[in-house]
Amino acid sequence: MSDVVLSAVPTPFAADGSLDLAGARRLFGFVAGVVDGLFVTGTTGEFPALDDDERLSLIETALSVAGPDRVIAHIGAPDAYRAARLAAAAVSLGATRIAAITPFYLAPSPTEVASYYLRIREAAPSAGLYAYIFPERTGVTVTPSQFCELADEVGLAGAKFSGAAALNVAACATARPSLRIFSGDDSDLAATLRAAGAGIISARSSAFPEVFAGLSAALRAAGAGKAPDASVTAAARQADVTAIAALGSSIGLVKEALRLRGFGPMGARMPVGFPDPATAARVGELVKSLAPAD
């Protein structure tokens, strides 16, 4: 796989909270046309507020517009029973890569975390399975040594480390170089790559895919020595990423930017931190300056 920038795409909802599947198809197609792939029905996709049929409909939509090799379908749940059923269903739809956040709400032991992933592996043996570690959202901390043990026992293909866990990307990627370790921190792609990470799974790239794809391309060209001005371009794109990151990391900010880019109301079911008027104005300024006019 050569994916470096995967977008953790939000789920479009109508103003009344109903799922906007047609809007999802349009959004997924747009983002997939710019970045390397999609991470669907994850945290940014408000997965706790989706029923199983809705999650599978969104996964099927992503697979149809981006292709199986460019989609990681998140099927994580609080319990192994539901996650395993979703995993099997996603694979039946054509998914070749699945991810699961650690079980949450009731605090699991490391043994229970491993059991959860083994149940998913048994339900979907042909799929590449990625652990999703996000302690701030789950209350589950997985140390680098625990992750390596988990990866070996379950046969993981990789992982996404978000929040405080993103600090463990270097340790885990170095200890298990055959795995694809992604960071959920999209503020410094170059640092992730220097730490031996595979790349980023980025919420903000859903709204500004051109910026993140441009940064990735410039870093690749600079590393290969193919373009004398690539380092200058990379620095400029990183400055754009820094400006985007300065707004904050809420899902509501991403949805506001997409709304301004013409992707419908981009409503939400969960409290996603929609911006206040002053912040919304700053989002609008960035959209005008960084997003190509359609």
Set out the residue ranges of the language-model regions.
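Alpha-helix C-cap/termination motif
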Residues: 34, 65-68, 93, 123, ...
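Active-site beta->alpha loop and helix N-cap motifs at the rims of alpha/beta catalytic domains
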Residues: 1-141
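Catalytic alpha/beta core domains of metabolic enzymes, predominantly
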Residues: 123-125, 134-246
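Short secondary-structure transition/capping segments
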Residues: 51-53, 110-113, 171-172, 194, ...
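A general structural signal for well-ordered alpha-helical segments in protein cores
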Residues: 24, 55, 59, 83, ...
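C-terminal alpha-helical cap/extension of soluble enzyme domains
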Residues: 5-11, 27-35, 194-197, 204-294
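Short secondary-structure capping/turn micro-motifs that flank functional sites
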Residues: 47-48, 106-107, 167, 190, ...
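Helix N-cap/beta->alpha junction signal
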Residues: 79, 185-186, 276
